[in-house]
UniProtKB/Swiss-Prot annotation:
One of its GO terms (molecular function) is ATP binding. Residues 9-237 form the Sigma-54 factor interaction domain. It holds the Pfam family Sigma54_activat. CDD domains: AAA (cd00009). One of its GO terms (biological process) is regulation of DNA-templated transcription. The gene is hrpS. It comes from the Bacteria. The lineage of its organism: Bacteria, Pseudomonadati, Pseudomonadota, Gammaproteobacteria, Pseudomonadales. This is Pathogenicity locus probable regulatory protein HrpS. Residues 279-298 bind DNA. Keywords: Activator, ATP-binding, DNA-binding, Hypersensitive response elicitation, Nucleotide-binding, Transcription, Transcription regulation, Two-component regulatory system. Regulates the activation of the sigma factor HrpL which itself induces the expression of hprD as well as other hrp loci which are involved in plant pathogenicity, hrmA and avr genes. Probably interacts with sigma-54. Gene3D superfamilies: 1.10.8.60, Homeodomain-like (1.10.10.60), P-loop containing nucleotide triphosphate hydrolases (3.40.50.300).
Amino acid sequence: MNLDDEFDDDLDAERVPNLGIVAESISQLGIDVLLSGETGTGKDTTARRIHNMSGRQGRFVPMNCAAIPESLAESELFGVVSGAYTGADRSRMGYIEAAQGGTLYLDEIDSMPLALQAKLLRVLETRALERLGSTSTIHLDICVIASAQASLDDAVEEGKFRRDLYFRLNVLTLKLPPLRDQPERILPLFTRFVAASAKELNVAIPDVCPLLQQVLTGHRWPGNIRELKAAAKRHVLGFPLLGADSQTEEHMACGLKFQLRAIEKALIQQALKRHRNCIDAASLELDIPRRTLYRRIKELSI
């Protein structure tokens, strides 16, 4: 496997020289890694790929630190024993313990409460934990990958993130650049996402006209790769590239006729697939005469 090719979708080889070698070294050494970058730049995918290359037999366990209420965060992360507090009627492991032998991925760690950061630091340093309400120590064999959208340097200076935890996590930081800083990747990625979406939806691959290319390269892509994937799927379906509310030159050039033609073609292709190219069954589902269906198949080059 060519590791540089495998990681090209998510990381910038110019910012991280010999990226494949770096990624492989990370996975084999099992060191803690910090991924930084805006939303949609591929942090989740990168974390999972590092785990997959590591050869670790345990699970890849993702935890979104921003999605768990602060009142539940400690028990969710460290686990709990029965009777530790009112409502804890059974013992259960937390995210950290569930990653035993594998990789714990702490997504949006910049959202973790300060009190929990101190306890996480102790786990990272000792590679051991006690479940909430227990004095029994559980020794850990885990790799930890954390990601942050905001700058942790700024969060430390603002008192929102512990300096010692930052230094502990910052053994190696991989910065994933936003798509707007890599304009040369927009068209190749979009073309590939369009092909993948067309295959998924079982429809023909639509053209990417020069005007559409201008729209793609002129957009800022605040949602980065995630937004680009969504735009590719909308294009395959014949919908406005940048969402229903956007008024771009692409919409005016393609017009309603183009959009309706693309939607009609997709509907006919999907009906034919469901009925194994049986014209009678497809025309019945689409509620159009057989003669009309034959004509539209020819006109739409299906």
